[in-house]
Amino acid sequence: MKPSLIIVTFIVVFMTISCVAADDEQETWIEKRGDCLPHLKRCKENNDCCSKKCKRRGANPEKRCR
């Protein structure tokens, strides 16, 4: 085998592994962000909301994220 073929193969394998790892990180980020619905999620404490703001809304005594 030629040394250049080995180098090209190594580069292709490295790029493939890098792309797969980047896709996994992106999916994890999307899952974390998808769990946050600020105007719909009920909260008991300020840290339950993604925006860190928990206030009473409307006449209902329950609190929702703002």
UniProtKB/Swiss-Prot annotation:
One of its GO terms (cellular component) is extracellular region. Disulfide bonds join 36-50, 43-54, 49-65. Residues 1-22 form the signal peptide. Residues 55-57 are annotated as: Essential for stimulation of [3H]ryanodine binding to RYR1. The keyword Signal applies. This toxin stabilizes ryanodine receptor 1 (RyR1) opening in a long-lasting subconductance state (40% of the full conductance state). Furthermore, it triggers calcium release from sarcoplasmic vesicles (64.2 nM are enough to induce a sharp release, and 50% of the total calcium is released after toxin (100 nM) addition) probably by acting as a cell-penetrating peptide (CPP). In addition, it has been shown to dose-dependently stimulate ryanodine binding to RyR1 (EC(50)=3.2 nM). This is Opicalcin-2. It comes from Opistophthalmus carinatus (African yellow leg scorpion). The lineage of its organism: Eukaryota, Metazoa, Ecdysozoa, Arthropoda, Chelicerata.
